[in-house]
Amino acid sequence: MNATQDMHPELGREVPVGRIDRELRQLWAEDEARTNASLINFAIYSEAPGSLERNSRVVEELTREHACRAMLIYIAREHPEPTIRAWITAHCHLRAGQKSVCCEQIAFALTGQMKGRLRNTVFAHLNSDLPLTFWWQGELSPIFSERLYSLVDRFIIDCASWGDPAAGFASVLAALADSPKLVVQDLEWTRTFQFRVSVAAMFDDPVAQAAIPSIQTVTIRHHPAHRLAALQILAWLATQSKWSEGRGLQLDDARRPGAVENFHFESRGGREVSARLVSDPSSPALGTLEIVAGDVSVEIVREAGASHLCRLL
């Protein structure tokens, strides 16, 4: 059975790979009222069935604000036969009642062994004048190699989806050492952003700032699927406060609902700092961050489904 035979029509017009550029020119010639806009190459890679359709909807929303040439890539590596199919479409949005501003999308479905097909065939359709942002969805596979990341300017990952985070980060660190221009963005780290900003803002208060050397306990409540976000913000707190580690922050512990993990640090003044990570299925990615230092207690809370944080001092 062809692993790519059932594709949603929203992917657009199926075209022979060798005719992609010609078909794109024809697409624009069919409607002169549309304007082609592109500021970056934006590629989304996945090995999950159904990802092309899901990611096409992602690109449709993204192009409302960000002009790009989008490339969707799905690969079924375990399929016995090497095949490749391609579709083209344009996501168009009206701007202030003027012409439709449209962004090109090329979707590729590949099966079987790659043997250079990703770089030589798929990447041949990048706009060579524009930087490449590459969003890798899911666990890193052997396809993540120098032949890929040497072409990438910004590499987006989400370590929350990794079954082996230690191996994944080792691969990313090796790529960074090999390709200094590469910029890596982890969506799990991005999920901690508002908490980090809130902590920094609260410790601008003179009372809270004076209490930093006296911090005794840190408690972080998180969703089981986002344990790494909790570890990342704990590591950030330890780094900012210059605590020394009593026990390494293990990446490979099981994700267990209701599980409590305990960590111990030593402050710059020699005090013991105890940290707890509490796994709660009812929590958003990060639900609560509580810091206690003597009589001072700082708490940052996000309720499930809320778009804002509450800060208590």
Regions found by a protein language model. Give the residues of each.
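An N-terminal, globular interaction/scaffold subdomain
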Residues: 1-137, 142
